Design a protein with these regions (language model features):
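Acidic, low-complexity, intrinsically disordered interaction modules
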Residues: 22-79
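N-terminal acidic leader/helix
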Residues: 2-35
Length: 79
């Protein structure tokens, strides 16, 4: 996906992309210790092509059980 395509993702498309990504990790025996929302963050963040806060805000605005402070704390060690 291009950065522009990522910016235009809907919530439904993000969930589908997340599910494809997790399936690929499992098929390739890749274990990642990130929460669901952290994995979604990595998809939206797109290696820094998109804003850190934009990605976090988008996820937490779409998912009511997303805790912004907890997500930021989880990501702090990586960014």
């Amino acid at each position: 996906m291009t950065t522009e395509e990522i910016r235009m993702l809907t919530k439904k498309e993000l969930v589908a992309e997340y599910e494809r990504t997790i399936k690929w990790y499992k098929e390739h025996n890749i274990n990642r210790n990130f929460s669901k929302y952290a994995e979604m963050f990595w998809i939206l963040f797109d290696d820094g092509a998109n804003s850190y806060m934009w990605a976090i805000d988008a996820i937490c605005s779409w998912f009511s059980d997303c805790n912004k402070e907890e997500l930021e704390k989880e990501l702090d060690g990586y960014i």
